[in-house]
């Protein structure tokens, strides 16, 4: 299982709407609003790195109102 945090910037005034929409996507375990450089943080799980990449492009970035994403895969040291 691969886990990642996805930091999201949204269009002005759309952060809550984006977080609600993303929270409904299968594979998302957390979607919360932030204050600062990013508007939403998402925790997502996938079966592989490739699946995670497809998930971000096909599911997360397809949500209206998103202007930029930064995906941070979790590593276990």
Q: Can you describe what each PLM-predicted range is?
A:
Residues 1-77:
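A compositional/biophysical signature of low hydrophobicity enriched in polar/charged and small residues
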């Amino acid at each position: 299982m691969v886990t990642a945090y996805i930091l999201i910037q949204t269009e002005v005034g759309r952060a809550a709407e984006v977080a609600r929409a993303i929270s409904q996507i299968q594979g998302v375990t957390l979607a919360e609003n932030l204050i600062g450089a990013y508007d939403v943080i998402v925790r997502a799980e996938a079966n592989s790195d490739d699946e995670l990449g497809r998930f971000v492009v096909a599911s997360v970035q397809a949500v209206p109102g998103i202007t930029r994403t930064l995906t941070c895969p979790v590593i276990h040291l």
